[in-house]
Amino acid sequence: IIFYLAKINKTFSHYFLEGIGVDYQTQINQVIETIKGDLPTLFEKDISYNIYTQDIYFQDPVNKFKGKVNYRIIFWTLRFHARLFFTEIHFDLHDVYQSAEDIITATWTVRGVLRVPWQAHIFFNGYSTYKLNQDGLIYEHKDTWDRKPGEILQQFFRKGKAHN
């Protein structure tokens, strides 16, 4: 019965969304706007999770996992470590755009000042690639950095400004 009701609900939702003119491209545009709103403040407040599938796959140079619960945990961990280890940290979002029919790309820079007496600065650029399913929800998020994790870690021991 539950499966049958879920199927009816999905069918109803599809017709309802079609009826009000919400199509795939509109959904992608909404996802782009959500990302644009979420990323600049990801070190300060939580992001919106309604644009991701339950089995979202995430990968960056140091992490790889699947599932929305784990995805939530990684963002909580980012905020926790940002408050604990940095006196100042920023996520500068440069651009978010649809790079293919089912792909969204975001370019960004992370920069901050470590909570250490020598006030080490960190700085690295990267881009996020989001893949969307047929419903316009993100099922894969991969981050690519312009430096290896070890190179970023070395910035922690330098005094003052990070080298670009």
At which residue positions do the language-model features occur?
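C-terminal and inter-domain tail/linker signature
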Residues: 1-164
